[in-house]
C-alpha cells in the first residue's frame, strides 16, 4: 500500500540522514583531535596568567596559540575570532592590507601595527619561542615562562593616547603602499581636506621625503617620538576609558579605539 511505502521511505531517509550526519561530523572533527588537544590546558593556564601579568591597561598579541586567549586574560588582543566587532574594524584592517572576516589575525611581519595599536606584551607557548623569534622583528624582549606561556615585551610599545607632529591628506594616504601604511600611521595622522583646514594649525603636513622613509629603524624612532608625547594614565572599564595627558601646546590625541555610532568622547 502507498502508506506502507511512504513509511518505509521516511524511515530510510531518516536512517541515512542520521548516519551521514554522524560520519560527516566525525570526519570533520578528526583534524581537531590533534590541534585542540591542548585547548583546555591553554585556557586553564590563561586563567592563571591573568593574575600574573603586569598591571595596567594595554593590548596584547598572541602567536600560534588558541583563539581568544585575550578574553580569558581580560585584555584587548590583536588575534580575535568572533563577529562581535566594531564595524569600523572592517574598513581599518583591509585598508592596511590585513584580512578581516570573522577573524582578526594580522601577521607578525606587520611589526608597525603593534606599535600603532599599543601592544605591550606578546604571549606564545615555550614550544613556539624559536619559531616566533625567527619570524618576528628585533623589537621583542623575552621576559619569562609564566603559567605555561612564554611572555615577551614589545620594545616599541607606545601607550594608548599619543600625539603627532605631522599629518597627511587622504589623497596621499590612498597612494601609499598598503603594507607600509602602519609605518606611515606611526608618523602622521590622516586628514580629509576639511579636517586639514580645521586642524592643520596643530600639525605640519608631512614632507614628501618623509613619506617614503618607512624602514624598521625609522619606525623605532617614530615610536620614540610618539611615546614622548603620550598619555601618562589610561584606565579602561566596561563603559569606556579615562586618560590623562600633559602637553606644552594644544594638539590632537590619537586613541586606537572604535568611534562608531553610539560612542561618545568628552574632553575637559
Where are the model-predicted features located?
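Transmembrane alpha-helical segments
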Residues: 1-2, 157
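Flexible, solvent-exposed extracytoplasmic
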Residues: 113, 118, 124-268
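Signature aromatic-anchored transmembrane alpha helix within multi-pass, membrane-resident enzymes
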Residues: 2-22
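Generic recognition of stable, solvent-exposed alpha-helical segments in well-folded globular domains
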Residues: 7-14, 44, 55, 68, ...
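Extracytoplasmic/lumenal acceptor-recognition loop(s) of multi-pass membrane glycoenzymes
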Residues: 16-36, 49-119, 157-159, 163-220
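Catalytic cores of large soluble enzymes that bind and process phosphate-bearing ligands
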Residues: 36-41, 247
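Active-site-proximal structural scaffolding
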Residues: 12, 39-46, 106-107, 115-116, ...
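Short alpha-helical segments and helix-capping/turn motifs at coil-helix boundaries
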Residues: 41-52, 105-110, 127-130, 137-138
